[in-house]
Amino acid sequence: MEDTRAEALPIGAAEAAAALQTLQRYKAGKAALDKRLIDNELWFRMGHWKNYRDPLMPDKAQPSSGWLFNSIANKHADAMDNYPEPMVLPRAADDQATAQALSSVLPVVLEQADYEQVYSDVWWRKLKQGTGVTGIFWDPAARGGLGDIAVRSVNLLMLYWEPGVQDIQDSPDLFHLSLEDTARLTAQYPQLAGHAAGVVDVPWYIHEDGQTTANKSVVVDWYYKRPDENGKLRLHYCKLCNGVVLYASQNDPALAARGLYDHGKYPFVFDPLFVEEDSPAGFGYIDVMKDCQNAIDRMNHAMDENVLLASRQRYVLSDTAGVNEEELADLSRDIVHVVGRLNEDSFRPLQTAGLQGNSLSYRNSRIEELKEISGNRDLTQGGTTGGVTAASAIAALQEAGSKLSRDMLKSAYRAFARQCYLIIELMRQFYDEQRVFRITGQRGESEFVPFSAQGLRAKPMPAVGGVELGSREPVFDIVVSAAKKSTFSRLSQNETAKECYKLGFFDPANADAALAALEMMDFEGVEKVRARVRQNGTLAQQLVQLQGQMARLSAALAQQPGGTQAAQDAAGLTAQLPVAAAARAMNWNGKEVK
């Protein structure tokens, strides 16, 4: 009876076998990319000589220089200096409060998901492999069974898609492979018992610690899109291992019609470094630099051997010379015995030519070439040439030389925005119960904000002329900025603030002129500065009106009998008004001035 029920399920053994055949077709189309990923990992670890090892000289020294590694490490440091932060903007005025709450809650959700570590791992893979992949999932077991959003860095080597698609969302099927312990899987899924033979193999990185897969099984996470009865594409999920279906969303009555996620997208965000046509994966800096790095390493290898040979005294020795070779090779002996007479024909030193200057110049030119093609010139690391010593000049050169880094960051920020959209969609679907998040207020204090999916779900539209307009789902825009800025960016921002202060931008009397100047300026946070200047300008107008009223009151008091003293007191109060009002506007010492 159980077999009959299993056959009646939408996803059974036949569907699993067909999915595995599709996986094999996808693997064949991705074989060249997998080989490149494995080779690039060796290049990054400076172990690429394994690909060029001479079988006749297995123990011969093969030096590797770290120019390529240094370039990638510097670019990763640039990425970590510009850690992203989201700001959510509403598209409708009714969603303003929800957008503000999301702007405060999203960074907390990312922090709880350990996103900074994920961001770092994705950037390493983006620079090494050419593509960084981030997975946005719903983990129902998190928070003690309450469930929460999980963010993972995904290994591109374990992902397979339809060959020829440019956007990963256009692939009809998507497979993610992983290795898990067979005994643990069997304990969790009893239907796996007796199916220990693997039916799928996975590519491997080359490791030095001798990893084994004896007790492992390949788990296939099969994501696929299929239309429902209304023609809308639904995302479904199936977990396979050794040809056995462990779980399928189409077999789950709660998800059979709805799909795994309501947003209907694959939970993977691809961020290619350099785009390739007809592929969601790109190529990285290792693919661009490894030929130049290989030439540098070969020259270093030849030069090292030349220096070693030149530093040792070697001899050309005839068989008839009669020299005791053991004594000659022993540098600790002062006397070397000889039988017969020596001459230049039977015994002479072997001279090794030293390094030529043009050889060193050529190697240095290849090093400069590698720096140039990777955009990792000395200026980007703080070095200077040509006598540049002024701090402002060095900063300007560094900013001008960081165009490639800014371009990479823009690509990463676009991918980060797509990740945030997926997170918001998961909140919309799964945040049924209200949760409390600790956020940092505008003045730096801790605040506790309740949040649920109520503000994210569809709201009924008011009827017009007795006609129901249905419901409207809130839609948001995401603007990404750098939460952790580089030292230069912070110094530049501080200098801008000091210049605005010195020029009197915050003086209420200069509000109109300051606003005219700020309209022509563009820097981060300029809208907040404009708002403060407008506030100061409004305050100045109120002060002028109040001073006029006080002057008229003083004149009226002076005309009254005995009103001279009262008029003087009023005049003194009028003189104090600008100081008190300015103090209130600037909010000195973080306290309200009364």
Regions found by a protein language model. Name each.
Residues 96, 100, 117, 283-286, ...:
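Conserved structured core elements
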Residues 512-552:
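Long, highly charged low-complexity segments enriched in Glu/Asp and Lys/Arg with interspersed Ser/Thr
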Residues 84-89, 117-125, 136-140, 306-319, ...:
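Short coil/turn segments at secondary-structure boundaries
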Residues 105-112, 292-310, 331-338, 353, ...:
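Generic, well-ordered alpha-helical scaffold segments in large soluble proteins
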Residues 555-594:
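Helical coiled-coil/dimerization "stalks"
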Residues 1-257, 320, 354-358, 362-365, ...:
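Extended, helix-rich architectural segments
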Residues 140, 392-511:
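Extended amphipathic alpha-helical segments with heptad-repeat/coiled-coil character used for oligomerization
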Residues 221-387:
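Extended, charged amphipathic alpha-helical segments
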